[in-house]
Regions:
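Intrinsically disordered, polar/acidic, low-complexity terminal segments
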Residues: 3-62, 67-90, 95-103, 199, ...
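Alpha-helical transmembrane segments
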Residues: 5-19, 103-110, 162-167, 205-212, ...
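Transmembrane catalytic cores of multi-pass membrane glycosyltransferases
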Residues: 20-76, 126, 175-323, 348-351, ...
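Membrane-interface micro-motifs in multi-pass membrane enzymes
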Residues: 104-147, 174, 301-319, 342-369
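Short hydrophobic alpha-helices at membrane interfaces in multi-pass membrane enzymes
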Residues: 148-169, 198-205
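Membrane-interface alpha helices of multi-pass inner-membrane proteins
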Residues: 158-186
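Signature aromatic-anchored transmembrane alpha helix within multi-pass, membrane-resident enzymes
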Residues: 159, 284-293, 325-341, 373-395
Length: 467
């Protein structure tokens, strides 16, 4: 990617993200963090709150840190979300080895164009964003730094320290991300040891960082409650209990790992097969193509046996990678495919699981598919630009009315509280299916007279609401 193209891509993406993140309203647990943020007046207050949550209910230290400091600080929240998403696009492209403007734009569109259920729990919802986007960003950044170190066969102390810090910090968010990072760090350490006949200091430092971060996360006393009936997240005791949980979770697991994600479910086979079409096909080429196409048809049109269809899809994907790619692209694609499975596997044994938990797997599958991208022609670049513009316009058509309703709500609350009203009527959000927990009583965490809950919020249809 030429410097001028790179600058245009980044500035365009930054502008689009800035507009959308400004339009996204607070929803669900964001209101709790909004009220909490107003009560944090010093670093000591913040540290005490983080330690208290680590000991009791929520050990995700860095996820909580970002969510708490952005509570009641809309400009900071807007800047953080815009910058972190832009960095995610940038380092995802770097990890995938993408150097063209069209490739960058296509990957950015893929990362943003999530299935609706995942999208509304990741981008519009601040609490979800700060727990799920940063760890993926940190992992991809670490992968890029580590790949450079292995290529140069040098492990300067600053680079090793950076990898140690990235490995440690990336673990202080979501649990399945943490497990995936530990497995990835261990694999890379062993692989470089076998390949180079000696351990790589860079890989060892990253692995050590992931172990230390995971130790801090999982030694939280809050995890002692996962077998209790009233815990927010639960894990059955014993092997039989775990297997029963895995069986119950299997439909959700297969749906949000692959079957319910058309961008990766269809995109990977399309890119892989198109990359091979110009060459002479052999019998061995037909096998992965048949597995990929057959499993896609199965997932789309056959309601039963979805788990088996997903299994065949991954078999076809690995077959395509090892048959149709070579060198660094093959290694990257296989690593990303395995990473997607490793990130999803722990979710089989915990309840409840939400679509947002599969964000890291979704991104890794996109990066695997990106290894099949051909060098773009001009017409392809224009098509990708038109696609990105269309998705941006669609988002505006959904979230601009939501933004206007959020402003109406805020004005109505301000007027009602000035009059001392104990019950406040508010209009429902339009397009509420694109928001997480949109019309919620959790507003009372941010709006109250003396104690949270002394105001009741009543939601009414837009046509029945009047100021």
């Amino acid at each position: 990617m030429r410097k001028q193209e790179k600058t245009v891509c980044i500035l365009t993406a930054a502008a689009a993200l800035a507009v959308l993140f400004w339009l996204f309203p607070l929803t669900g647990d964001d209101w709790y963090r909004e009220g909490l943020g107003r009560g944090l007046h010093s670093l000591g207050d913040l540290a005490r709150e983080l330690i208290f949550r680590w000991k009791t209910t929520n050990p995700r230290l860095l996820g909580n840190l970002l969510a708490y400091i952005s509570g009641s600080r809309p400009i900071l929240r807007w800047l953080l979300r815009t910058a972190l998403t832009l960095l995610l696009f940038r380092f995802a492209a770097k990890a995938a080895g993408i150097r063209s403007a069209a490739g960058f734009a296509l990957l950015a569109v893929g990362i943003f164009a999530l299935p609706r259920e995942i999208f509304r729990q990741i981008y519009p919802w601040s609490a979800g964003f700060f727990n799920y986007v940063p760890p993926v960003l940190l992992s991809l950044l670490a992968f890029s730094v580590l790949e450079e170190a292995l290529e140069e066969q040098k492990a300067a102390p600053p680079r090793c320290a950076t990898l140690l810090l990235l490995g440690f910090a990336g673990q202080l968010f979501m649990e399945n991300n943490a497990v995936c990072a530990v497995l990835a760090g261990g694999f890379l350490t062993v692989w470089t040891w076998v390949r180079c006949k000696r351990p790589s200091p860079a890989a060892v430092c990253y692995f050590l960082g992931t172990l230390l971060g995971a130790a801090l996360l999982f030694t939280s006393p809050s995890y002692r409650r996962v077998t209790e009936a009233d815990a927010a997240y639960q894990m059955a005791g014993g092997l039989a209990g775990l297997m029963h949980t895995a069986k119950e979770n299997l439909p959700e697991l297969t749906r949000w790992l692959l079957a319910g994600c058309p961008v990766v479910c269809l995109g990977f086979p399309a890119l892989a097969i198109l990359s091979r079409c110009k060459q002479k096909l052999t019998v061995l080429d037909i096998v992965p193509a048949t597995l990929l196409c057959g499993s896609v048809v199965w997932m789309l049109f056959v309601p039963w046996g979805q788990a088996l269809a997903v299994l065949f899809w991954f078999l076809g994907a690995f077959g395509a990678v090892f048959r149709w790619l070579s060198g660094r692209k093959r290694r990257r694609a296989a690593f990303f495919l395995a990473g997607a499975l490793a990130a999803a596997a722990p979710l089989a044994f915990v309840t409840p699981i939400g679509p947002r938990c599969f964000f890291v797997s979704y991104v890794l599958l996109l990066l695997a598919a990106a290894q099949f991208l051909p060098p773009p022609a001009l017409w392809q670049t224009l098509c990708v630009g038109a696609l990105a513009a269309g998705i941006f316009a669609a988002c505006l058509s959904i979230y601009l009315p939501i933004f206007r309703t959020a402003q109406v709500r805020e004005d109505a609350i301000t007027r009602a509280m000035a009059l001392g009203q104990a019950q406040i009527a508010l209009p429902f959000f339009p397009h509420a299916e694109y928001l997480w927990d949109a019309d919620t009583q959790k507003l009372c965490r941010a709006y109250y007279y003396e104690t949270p809950g002394d105001i009741e919020f009543v939601f009414v249809p837009q046509e029945d609401w009047s100021p």
